[in-house]
Amino acid sequence: MKISKGKYKMKIWNSGKSTAYNVDFKVPEECKGMVLKQKVPYEFLETGKSFEEIVLVYYGTPDKFKVTTTWSNKEGHEYSKEQIVSI
C-alpha cells in the first residue's frame, strides 16, 4: 500500500482461527534498512486483526523480497510462514 512518494506500508494480519502472540517478522539482510520495525514484537494479534509497518522504497530497491512472519500460540508453540512481498 503506497502512502507517499517512496513510502509504502506492509500489512501483517492474522487470518488464523486463534490469537497469535509475540508476532514478529524477518527480512533478508539486504532489505533491513527498507522495512521499519517500529511495532514488533506485537504482543498479541487477534483473529482478523492487522498492523502495518513502513517500507521505504528508493532507487535500487528490490521489486520483491521474502518476509518470514513468526508467532506463537497461547501454549507457547512457535510458528512461522514465509511469503514474498512485491512492490
Please report, for each region that a protein language model flagged, where it lies by residue.
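Amphipathic alpha-helical "stem/stalk" segments
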Residues: M1-I87
